[in-house]
Swiss-Prot record:
PANTHER family linked: 3-KETO-L-GULONATE-6-PHOSPHATE DECARBOXYLASE SGBH-RELATED (PTHR35039:SF3)
Family to which the UniProt record says this protein belongs: Belongs to the HPS/KGPDC family. KGPDC subfamily.
Binding, Mg(2+): 33, 62
Pfam families the record matches: OMPdecase
The name this protein goes by in its record: 3-keto-L-gulonate-6-phosphate decarboxylase UlaD
Subunit relationships: Homodimer.
Cofactor: record remark: Binds 1 Mg(2+) ion per subunit.
Pathway info: Cofactor degradation; L-ascorbate degradation; D-xylulose 5-phosphate from L-ascorbate: step 2/4
Site keyed Transition state stabilizer: positions: 64, 67
Keyword annotations of the record: Carbohydrate metabolism, Decarboxylase, Lyase, Magnesium, Metal-binding
EC number: 4.1.1.85
Catalytic activity field: 3-dehydro-L-gulonate 6-phosphate + H(+) = L-xylulose 5-phosphate + CO2
SUPFAM superfamilies per the UniProt record, alphabetical: Ribulose-phoshate binding barrel
Length: 216
């Protein structure tokens, strides 16, 4: 089982605040996510600028595309994104369109599982050639006190068994990682637990150490 990668979510409102994070921890993570908030706040230039600064890192545009899959994904890939996200409620043809464009750029598409989705949809994504999904405990759910539970673990295992590369996100803290031990997680996303730590560098390194201990 390969080691899960570590992704930092830049859900900053401005590039200036995003740079405060990347200056510290870009070299400590595998993937730099231009979060949805930053995508809205700064547009695709955020993707272009971060990829220019860190060409050796995977840069994800968390655009959560809901429609116009080809147009919006092309905007992201032309800004040098490596991966883009499509929201789970999007029509299957939106996901297919985004994937078609991704292939032109040797990129990839992730289906963002935020909100309601079905196993029938999951099979449609697999049949369409989608390889990646993001299992997401929403920001608002976290704020309401919703914790990771057995239903989450069961769903993540099932997605993995279907052949998906599964990314896990949603207010992850270091203490959550053992919950997922034994599952071939593709990526763990940490946002505020790294960005807002007293020492973001040490927080990122602790995540990497824990991943190596649990999956090594």
């Amino acid at each position: 089982m390969s080691l899960p990668m570590l992704q930092v979510a830049l859900d900053n409102q401005t590039m200036d605040s995003a740079y405060e994070t990347t200056r510290l921890i870009a070299e400590e993570v595998d993937i730099i996510e231009v979060g949805t908030i930053l995508c809205v706040g700064e547009g695709v230039r955020a993707v272009r600028d971060l990829k220019a600064l860190y060409p050796h890192k995977i840069v994800l545009a968390d655009a959560k595309i809901a429609d116009a899959g080809k147009i919006l994904s092309r905007m992201c890939f032309e800004a040098n994104a490596d991966w883009v996200t499509v929201i789970c409620c999007a029509d299957i043809n939106t996901a297919k369109g985004a994937l078609d464009v991704a292939k032109e750029f040797n990129g990839d598409v992730q289906i963002e599982l935020t909100g309601y989705w079905t196993w029938e949809q999951a099979q449609q994504w697999r049949d369409a050639g989608i390889q990646q999904v993001v299992y997401h405990r929403s920001r608002d759910a976290q704020a309401a006190g919703v914790a990771w539970g057995e239903a989450d673990i069961t769903a993540i295992k099932r997605l993995s068994d279907m052949g998906f590369k599964v990314t896990v996100t949603g207010g992850l803290v270091l203490e959550d990682l053992p919950l997922f031990k034994g599952i071939p997680i593709h990526v763990f996303i940490a946002g505020r637990s790294i960005r807002d730590a007293a020492s973001p560098v040490e927080a990122a390194r602790q995540f990497k150490r824990s991943i190596a201990e649990l999956w090594g």
